């Protein structure tokens, strides 16, 4: 406008575009005919790129011959010496170049540029519609360019050198995403087949460079530097390329049973990202739904452990063995219950999973739920348990009722007792459920156990001679102390070291705001203040040694003291 003569100013203003759409149309018209093909390709790439593309990455796209349906080939003669000039010359003012972490990144000059280029408004323009960018074909362009970059390198190129190629890093990270968009897989079929051909060096070299972690697992027994023969089928199944999987199965039918990577077989891999059509195809070609891989896991073991309900349902509906045992005897139900996957536990039980199957440690899914699980899983498995008095040999021979007494809630213990749990079973440390509930202050469980006749064994003691009353006073659980005293607990019963409950209250294990009240309560029930333990000390002496001077003072006022 600065260069306009005053007499031409009004006409110039009138000729300015009336909207952004008009502005972009004018820019598109100004693109040189010789540059239109390159400009369109670069705009397509910018519209669907997985991350902002660097100048050299976009310029490299121009160096590929992407003839429709063919295998992309890099033409070194098409590379521009001045890559920034190549990009700007092709795309005019629709794009801009910015510096980002020492890289020159190409982006649309405004977010509205992409919106316009992909809009129906441009698609229905008479003159500029050839610049309309449909999303799926644009992904196909980038997928082809990415595969072209991967096909440019073979087994002689190591990982470091590969990442020096302009488009290699982007291709490795994003080619799958572009190829899986819509029907792009069909468009790039020839390129995919060429890349995944295990008789050619390309896929094996790329897999070895970028997926060494896939080769260093107990699922793959081959030389860790060489991809297994089923690696291409495994990867195609993992990423959901159904058409490619079908062609590979026809070409190499035996590979459906082979291990291909860390997930195991192609069937294992297909289920990782819910590619059920691919999984169904693999089953139709003879894949074993109970095939094994690392840790002797079947696909159902994997899905049950990670908590993938949709996959679990698909597997059980297709005949997966719900009671199959993996390493250490773990079943799918054992894994799902220890990982707290309630819906998966329910699904497995609906299909016949056993809650009492023993694993190597002697535990069962039901016992593990009692030890660690939330109450909803415990109750679910309890409804299917055959033996509610089963013991855990590696955990003190505890029964489910021991765990309920330790953890609560009372509803857990109540359900066990209603199912016939024995109230006074001893574990290997001579603990009854009442002893444990008293130690952990589970007053609701204590009350329930007493209602179920545990009071007949209120004087039972553990391997140290401590009774339930010793446990409750030593940990400051005053409500439990009251209940035990009310039902006749021995207030002067000594343990193996001669400690009476009063000794233990005076020299408690756990500080409690109720310490003085507990001592007074024991005195009210006739505790002997003169009783001495095996060290010859009275309760007052133990309190003094423990620095509990308020208790010493309380005991000193007792008449017998």
Provide a role label for each language-model segment.
Residues 431, 439, 457, 462-466, ...:
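Eukaryotic tandem repeat interaction scaffolds
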Residues 225-233, 258-266, 292-298, 325-331, ...:
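Ankyrin-repeat boundary/"N-cap" motif
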Residues 243-244, 277-278, 310-311, 343-344, ...:
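Conserved ankyrin/ankyrin-like repeat signature
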